[in-house]
Amino acid sequence: MNRILSGSCLVFLLIFGLSCSKTKEKLTEFDIDYTNTLTVPASSYTVDVPAEFLTPEIPTESESKFSAQKTAKDHIDEIKMTRFNISVSSGDLSVLKSIDIYLKSTGQSDVLIASKSNIGSGVTSTSADLKDVNIKNYIFNDKIQFKVRLLIGGGSSFNQQIKMDQTIHVKAKLIK
């Protein structure tokens, strides 16, 4: 009886052990940086009324960037914005009451990805507050664009080139 019980346990452990020896998928994580500039002419807004501006389209180059990391579009789990810095080379950002940044891409709805309000006096650079949004379907497209909604307060005129630096973080499985 003990032999049968021992044999049954051995067979069970062998079958269970083999079924659990599934190969784990190898994962990778990496960052991609983008930079673009938005021109805000002084004549294009009214004080205390939101004004919207579009950046030029930005090539994502996602296929080549994924390939360089040994992954592909169908292996991507998530892509999230991890940094969105806003800066000006002359003057400052203090005339801005708030800024909302939306991501645009063909076939996708505009999505709010970052915002900033209460920008201090004399500030020439600030980090936007990021939203927790998976933007992988936007980055899969060939080009992205930002729609920027500014609320400009009173004071001096705001005629600026706003530099925007972004970092996205990609989580993916490696191609076997």
Predicted regions and their residues:
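Bacterial N-terminal signal peptides that target proteins for export
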Residues: 1-9
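Short, surface-exposed beta-strand/strand-loop-strand elements in extracellular ectodomains
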Residues: 93-109
